[in-house]
UniProtKB/Swiss-Prot annotation:
Highest taxon of the lineage: Bacteria
EC number: 2.7.11.32, 2.7.4.27
Source species of the chain: Caldanaerobacter subterraneus subsp. tengcongensis (strain DSM 15242 / JCM 11007 / NBRC 100824 / MB4)
A Pfam family annotated for this UniProt entry: Kinase-PPPase
Designated name of the protein: Putative pyruvate, phosphate dikinase regulatory protein
Catalytic activity: N(tele)-phospho-L-histidyl/L-threonyl-[pyruvate, phosphate dikinase] + ADP = N(tele)-phospho-L-histidyl/O-phospho-L-threonyl-[pyruvate, phosphate dikinase] + AMP + H(+); N(tele)-phospho-L-histidyl/O-phospho-L-threonyl-[pyruvate, phosphate dikinase] + phosphate + H(+) = N(tele)-phospho-L-histidyl/L-threonyl-[pyruvate, phosphate dikinase] + diphosphate
Keyword Transferase: yes
Spans traversing the lipid bilayer: none
Length: 270
């Protein structure tokens, strides 16, 4: 039986480059990939020690790395060779060629900036999850953007998309039977974006949602009367708030997000 291979992806910045190259290379073989381990932002020899020791415990492992910091790269190379582990430097030859041609040494400030960007993105994504669907009204006060609207207007994916643009976004469903939290009326309405939609389109979306859950699609939730009632109520709330209203009918999440980003930059919503 052909032995599987374990791949260890290591980087002192984001590991995506190593992962992409490894995936493309592996596609040329019928090799069984037993496991893939990823290590981003490796910044000291203790981390390298742990990674190499783990790889050494696998009978057939490969370390693929994009290390730039010279001391760490050399240490990784040395430790891997000591344990007889195959190691591939996919970034080094390119950096060396540029350095030889220009006489300029690579700088590592970008690694720090990249890590800070990564941590910031994780922070805003966690924010979007924590304050999704009105879970905690405190999120309304802390958010850069608050998205409101009836159910199935893509509030959650919109907030996640905005999070990837480093924007802390919370969202809140508007339901006729439940008064909006007072926090919604305490913040600057310029931070609030109301989503509305054509009732007929929303009815279809909700019916499909019910079917996907194995439920009867003639439930009150997906009736035209109920949908119109919810949208009317939501638009009344938006009018009271004086917030920006976006019609998301047949709009992709990216398109709606770009409208919001444009407004935040001082542009128009249309």
């Amino acid at each position: 039986m052909q032995e599987g291979v374990s791949i260890y992806l290591v980087s002192d910045s984001n590991v995506d480059t190593a992962e992409n190259i490894a995936s493309i290379a592996a596609a040329h073989f019928d090799t069984f990939i037993e496991k893939i381990k990823k290590y981003s932002y490796v910044g000291d020899i203790n981390q390298i020690e742990d990674i190499v020791m783990e790889a050494a415990n696998d009978s057939n492992s490969i370390i693929i790395h994009t290390m730039v910091v010279k001391e760490l790269k050399e240490y990784l190379q040395k430790k891997a060779q000591k344990f007889g582990i195959k190691i591939v430097d996919v970034m080094g030859p390119v950096i060396d060629a540029i350095e030889d041609s220009t006489g300029i040494s690579p700088h590592t400030e970008l690694l720090r900036d990249s890590k800070e960007d990564y941590l910031k993105k994780i922070e805003v994504i966690e924010f979007a999850v924590k304050y999704d669907d009105g879970k905690d009204p405190m999120g309304i006060l802390l958010a850069d953007v608050v998205v409101i609207g009836v159910s199935r207007t893509s509030k959650t994916p919109l907030c996640m998309y905005l999070a990837h643009k480093y924007i802390k976004a919370a969202n809140l469903p508007l339901v006729p039977e439940i008064d909006p939290p007072r926090e919604l009326f305490e913040i600057n309405p310029k931070k609030i974006f109301g989503l509305t939609i054509d009732p007929e389109v929303l009815v279809k979306i909700r019916k499909e949602r019910l079917k996907s859950l194995g439920l009867n699609d003639n439930a009150l939730y997906a009736t035209e009367e109920r949908v119109k009632k919810e949208i009317q109520y939501a638009e009344e709330v938006m009018q009271k708030l004086g917030c920006t209203v976006i019609d998301v009918t047949n709009k992709a999440v990216e398109e709606t997000a770009n409208i919001i980003l444009n407004v935040l930059r001082g542009g128009e919503s249309t």
